[in-house]
Amino acid sequence: MNQIFANPLSLPGTAQERVSRAVDSLRQGQGVIVVDDEDRENEGDLIFAAETLTAEQMSRMIRDGSGIVCLILTDPDLDRLALPPMVAHNTSRNGTGFTVSIEAREGVTTGVSAADRVTTIRAAIDPASTADDLARPGHVFPLRAHADGLSARRGHTEATIALMRLAGLRPAGVLCEVMNPDGTMARLPTLIGYGQAHGLPIVSIEDLVAVGAR
């Protein structure tokens, strides 16, 4: 395990305690910050459950994050929506599973506003929705979680689905990387301070693996 996550001064409490706090926050309709290790992306992602996401929470992701808001989905939802990969041959460093970007066909204006993006996400996760309910391209970026979860890929994408399942929520989440005001990526301990300031518990991907989450 990378030292920054093994060190209790970095992330207070045990892995189980951190996971429990994150799960409780999601169940209450609030967000969490998920961090990976410095040998991977070394980033913290702000994550919310797709089914409880509000326009205010979306605004926070746009304002405090990279602006690239991603909707994490599993195979059944992506197949229902007939969303193909963004590219035929994925050569990205971490094999991130981007599909084509989407927009709700109804109920949005330009699709860029926080409210419009929430409308798009709600349309996508509606079990009754089909490919005809979405326009492509758009301003929401779906990501396909690996079918074998964290056992196959230890990414923020798979961590999002693992957290939703632990919380008893539908397997769909929304994430955006947290950034500093100067445009650089936020790292620990900045992420810890950000989480404390906004009441967002922090959990690491290693924590999720340690408690057996998939």
From Swiss-Prot:
Binding annotation for Mg(2+) 1: 41
Cofactor(s) it depends on: Mg(2+); Mn(2+)
Gene Ontology BP annotations: riboflavin biosynthetic process
A GO cellular-component term linked to this record: cytosol
UniProt xrefs under Pfam families: DHBP_synthase
Coiled-coil boundaries: none
Binding annotation for Mg(2+) 2: 41, 156
Function, as annotated: Catalyzes the conversion of D-ribulose 5-phosphate to formate and 3,4-dihydroxy-2-butanone 4-phosphate.
Known partners and oligomeric status: Homodimer.
Name this polypeptide is given: 3,4-dihydroxy-2-butanone 4-phosphate synthase
Gene expressing this chain: ribB
